[in-house]
Amino acid sequence: GGNIALFFMTVQKDFSDKNGNYDILLKHVADRQLRRIIDVGAWWGPWSLFWQSHAEKLEIFEPNKKILPMLAQNISKFNNCTLHKTALGESKGTVSMAYDTHSGTNHVTDFKGDTEINTLDSYSFDNVDVIKIDVEGYEIPVLKGAKHTIITNQPIIQIEGNSSGQRYGISKKQIMELLTSWGMTRIEKKW
């Protein structure tokens, strides 16, 4: 598994990309034909809009019912985008979510509710070259529900992280340890 690449980055509230995050990503995928990219926690679609021109297929996951109309409108002109109106986690079911439409800091609050949750593995995606995850601290359940997809496809993984994992008792160190145990290699050290 040493050929699996892992990319970490910090949350970016300014989408002008003055920190060069798009360039950092592109240097790692420039020589690859990107077949499928998965955007987990898409919000209104800033990364989806960036990625759609770099992939044959873009699978977009966003559970926030308040932001979904804007996201759907933003990607509507692109034939390679599929919107999945669900949260992702370690198992299937329903959850309650707290939504902040302005900041994009939506997160799971309870494991009963009206928001559908699935595992990424349940979709049986193949040819996955990049997985972007921005789930406000819920990274470990999302990753555990994507273990087969990750190990089978060996994608670059972009995790947008801050200290929000503390609400679930999850640290960045635990995320790195989990991915390292699956043979992942860290290729950027911005996190």
PLM ranges: what are they?
Residues 1-191:
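Phosphate/nucleotide-binding beta-alpha loop and adjacent structural elements of enzyme active sites
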